[in-house]
Amino acid sequence: IIAIDSGFPLFFTQQRTGFMGRPYTLFKLRTMKRNAEKKGAEWAKEKDNRVTRCGKFLRKWRIDEIPQFLNVIKGEMSIVGPRPERPEFQEDLIKQVPHWNCRHLVKPGLTGWAQIRYRYASDADASEEKLAYDLYYIKHASTLVDLQIILSTLRSIAQGSR
């Protein structure tokens, strides 16, 4: 479907910052137009005009995230944890947002407390608000909390909401 809608490549890789600040390559299905960032890195937005028609569907049902299970298998991510950030944004966030690096005390996740409670952060101010949810998760992480997050994520996916 991706190839019919917007051509190849089908997969998208991007550097992210993981556990203890280590970089790794994140895998996703491509949902944006090719060369969407030819002008440089941009924050993703809820209504992002760089997203293809097919990409809107894939994102709505979170199908674009499925390749990240490879990152989980490789030990770079867990199912639940703070979402990983891009190094391009990471440097600024470390300077602007107190305690930002605390997010790296756990592996990044496919879903997290911030994703079910806050959604998108498209600037440093929103990222600071979202950090409070990540820190709450880190402080209260447990099998029960992980299960609650997973069930909330599955409910959100079933409803087709982000």
Which residues does each predicted region cover?
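A hydrophobic, helix-centered structural microdomain
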Residues: I1-A36, N71, T143-R162
